[in-house]
């Protein structure tokens, strides 16, 4: 049985989501059309509304519906600290920890020369302007511990060298509750060299 062009378009659209291959996209499309047409319509409306109303915060670059997000407007936040993360999901993870009360800057990515992502694509100029505005005293680089995240952290640290705020990096170490025999060797090596 040949699929309709509309069904193929839906499958292709679903494949744009991270981690969704052809088979998963087909299963989702068939499920929505066969078992949950009302859910499919709600999803379509929610996507349309999000695309129309969600924008980047003028200060920190995260997602918001207002020109400036609620975190940036919160007077209780520690304004001398600025935590740099790759994505809004990373920002949410830091917030869930409950241990950070400063402000954020969301890069919306990381350097990846192989993928054609350079310093202009991650808003480095905007970050530098924010970090050197005289208010920020500590910039905490919380990029991921991947090759791209490390490269991004290095470029940020070099760009800010001697320009104002101190630059710190998240510590690496053995996760709480883990057993050493199951921890990867790189993490053990970093935990030993960065011990306090």
Swiss-Prot record:
Q: Does the keyword DNA damage apply?
A: yes
Coiled-coil zones: none
Q: Which domain of life is it from?
A: Bacteria
Q: Which GO terms describe its biological process?
A: DNA recombination; DNA repair
Alphabetic keyword roster: DNA damage, DNA recombination, DNA repair, Metal-binding, Zinc, Zinc-finger
InterPro entries xrefs? DNA_Rcmb_RecR (IPR000093), Rcmb_RecR (IPR023627), Rcmb_RecR_Znf (IPR015967), TOPRIM_dom (IPR006171), TOPRIM_RecR (IPR034137)
Per its UniProt record, what Pfam families does this chain match?
RecR_C (PF21175), RecR_HhH (PF21176), RecR_ZnF (PF02132), Toprim_4 (PF13662)
Which residue ranges does the record assign to the Toprim domain? 80-175
User: What does the record give under GO molecular function?
Assistant: DNA binding; zinc ion binding
Q: Where are the zinc fingers (C4-type)?
A: 57-72
Q: What does this protein do?
A: May play a role in DNA repair. It seems to be involved in an RecBC-independent recombinational process of DNA repair. It may act with RecF and RecO.
Q: Which family does it belong to?
A: Belongs to the RecR family.
The entry's protein name is Recombination protein RecR
Q: Tell me which species this is from.
A: Methylibium petroleiphilum (strain ATCC BAA-1232 / LMG 22953 / PM1)
């Amino acid at each position: 049985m040949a699929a309709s062009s509309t069904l193929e378009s839906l499958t292709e659209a679903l494949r744009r989501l991270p981690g969704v291959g052809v088979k998963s996209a087909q299963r989702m499309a068939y499920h929505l059309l066969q078992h949950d047409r009302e859910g499919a319509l709600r999803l379509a409306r929610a996507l349309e509304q999000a695309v129309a109303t969600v924008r980047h915060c003028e200060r920190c670059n995260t997602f918001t519906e207002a020109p400036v997000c609620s975190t940036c407007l919160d007077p209780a936040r520690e304004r001398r600290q600025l935590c740099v993360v790759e994505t809004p999901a990373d920002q949410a993870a830091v917030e869930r920890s409950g241990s950070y009360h400063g402000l954020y800057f969301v890069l919306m990515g990381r350097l990846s020369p192989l993928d054609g992502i350079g310093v202009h694509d991650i808003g480095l100029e905007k970050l530098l302007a924010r970090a050197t505005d005289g208010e920020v005293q500590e910039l905490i680089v919380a990029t991921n511990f991947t090759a791209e995240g490390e490269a991004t952290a290095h470029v940020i640290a070099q760009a800010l060298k001697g320009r104002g705020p101190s630059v710190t990096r998240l510590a690496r170490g053995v996760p709480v509750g883990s057993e050493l025999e199951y921890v990867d060797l790189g993490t053990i090596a970093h935990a030993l060299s960065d011990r306090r």
